[in-house]
Amino acid sequence: MEQKLGNLVKKNVVNSVFQGRSLLAEKDFTPMELEYLIDFALHLKALKKLGISHRYLEGKNIALLFEKTSTRTRSAFTTASIDLGAHPEFLGSNDIQLGKKESVEDTARVLGSMFDGIEFRGFKQSVVDDLARYSGVPVWNGLTDEWHPTQMLADFMTIKENFGHIKNINLSYMGDGRNNTANSLLITGSMLGANIRIVSPKELQPSEKTTELAKKFAEKSGSRFLITDNIDEGVSKTNVLYTDVWVSMGESDWEDRVKLLKPYQVNMETIRKTSTPDDQLIFMHCLPAFHDINTDYGHEIFEKYGIKEMEVTDEVFRSIYARQFEEAENRMHSIKAIMAATLGNLFIPHV
């Protein structure tokens, strides 16, 4: 009897949709699976607000690997782990030697023997891929130079909260169209049926490889995407104006980037160009944002280039359209959903 029960448990674990899987890029999951995770995140957010316990990771140990510094990702994974009953352990760039003094494979095998799940935030996509390949435990991509999948769950969760649906929503991303956020928005939106516009100068538009992948997903979902340097065309009748920092972590070409992207700043004129009613338009930003000179970076840019605001003006950042802090909070709830689904004591047979 015990043997039969054990076999049944093993069979169920194997057949559970999410159990043991890693989230390395959005394309690792089907559109229906992403929609399920978004709805699960909304459910977990409701439980959190009601003070209802949801400790699906009781007794689990989670390694948080950070080559790149972070406020939101670290805070979200830490609080999500604790709420779920797990113990998070932070390992910063001075604690891990990925590919330097120890190979990624060796590190993965060691961490996999001690931890039940691993989050990685860093530079190379190959590192998070290898952590998943060799650790034997679920691995979650907190950000790489190519993709930002945990951000996407929070972003599209925020969109669904505000509009009640994702399909046919128009989202215009303004800025560096080659960075991880732009890549992930284009792919995720195309998977989920949202119409994504990447509004960037020609020098900073997505790669052909990324657009070809988006095209395949868009054909299946019925969504439409647009890559353009024409701001008027890119923001017309949009529902979501989205932007990101002009220079990503690890980059240093501020002067060229400021010159290229200054026309693509999200300001009140951009809002007017959308011609979208106020109740059908929101602004989003994955943060941090340079909307004033109250930071060292902001002050430095002002001293060098004479601009007090970069990718978004302070007026828009503090306007009725702004949802960036709601979006930031949703990092915790959506990360909680992916951790619980892939590692928790849940059985999800299908979606």
From Swiss-Prot:
> Which controlled-vocabulary keywords does the entry list?
Arginine metabolism, Cytoplasm, Transferase
What's its EC? 2.1.3.3
Looking up Gene3D superfamilies in the UniProt record yields: Aspartate/ornithine carbamoyltransferase
- UniProt enzyme class: transferase
Highest taxon above the source species = Bacteria
- Alphabetical list of Pfam families matching this protein: OTCace, OTCace_N
Q: Which residues bind carbamoyl phosphate?
A: S70, T71, R72, T73, Q97, R121, H148, P149, T150, Q151, C286, L287, R331
SUPFAM superfamilies in UniProt: Aspartate/ornithine carbamoyltransferase
Family, as annotated: Belongs to the aspartate/ornithine carbamoyltransferase superfamily. OTCase family.
| Name of the molecule in the record | Ornithine carbamoyltransferase, catabolic
Gene designation: arcB
